[in-house]
Design a protein with these regions (language model features):
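Conserved beta-strand hairpin/beta-sheet module of binuclear metal-dependent hydrolase folds
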Residues: 1-19, 102-118, 135
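Active-site metal-binding motif and surrounding structural segment of the metallo-beta-lactamase
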Residues: 9-56
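Active-site glycine- and acidic-residue-rich loops that bind
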Residues: 115-127
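Cap/insert and terminal regions of metallo-dependent hydrolase folds
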Residues: 125-165
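Short amphipathic alpha-helix with an adjacent loop that forms part of the alpha/beta core around
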Residues: 16-20, 82-86, 126-129
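Active-site neighborhood of phospho(di)ester-bond hydrolases with catalytic His/Asp-centered motifs
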Residues: 2-6, 27-34, 55-58, 114-118, ...
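Active-site environment of divalent metal-dependent phosphoester hydrolases
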Residues: 35-39, 61-63, 98-99, 121-124, ...
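Metallo-beta-lactamase
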Residues: 56-110
């Protein structure tokens, strides 16, 4: 299973090969939100990987500008569990400046992996969801001092430092 497809398709496929994962073994792509650094290669990945669908909520699908074939799309409701093969997937809301961004907890064989990307700030609900995770992937995409000293325009710095990241 992949979480997002924001890097180049070439890098994704090379990464699968480098880690010994067959393309046929990838069972889905879980989309966290529609920003280009999370979905850039979604069309090519869903086209090249024969057995997969991409999973997103309705608002995220509506906001994604890069087309994904209808037969490769699956829609879930944030807060409602669903299955991909033997994996129980629990999408939960996160604060970010996107249509309906989510984090995921993935359960299999009494293990929990939780993934939170681009979170503007940690909420009690997020803490409650991830507290028992056996593995937590938490994207920390800026350090305040480096961001403030960097070359981003002021409006972007303000947005990143805001409550929705």
């Amino acid at each position: 299973m992949l979480i997002d497809a924001g890097i180049s398709g070439k890098k994704i496929f090379q990464g699968l090969e480098d880690t010994g994962v067959s393309m046929e073994d990838v069972c889905g792509v879980l989309v966290t939100h529609e920003h280009i650094d999370h979905v850039k290669s979604l069309p090519i990945v869903t086209k090249k990987l024969p057995n997969i669908k991409a999973y997103a909520n309705e608002n995220t699908w509506a906001a994604i500008e890069r087309p994904v074939a209808d037969e490769k799309r699956a829609t879930f409701h944030t807060g409602e569990d669903f299955y991909i093969e033997d994996f129980l997937i629990r999408p939960f809301p996160i604060p970010h400046d996107a249509a309906e961004p989510v984090g995921y907890s993935i359960y299999i064989a009494d293990r929990q992996i939780s993934i939170v990307t681009d979170v503007g700030h940690m909420t009690d609900e997020i803490f409650e969801e991830i507290i028992d995770a056996d593995l937590l992937v938490l994207e920390a995409n800026h350090e305040e001092e480096i961001l403030l000293m960097g070359s981003y325009p002021y409006h972007l710095k303000r947005r990143i430092l805001g409550e929705k990241g």
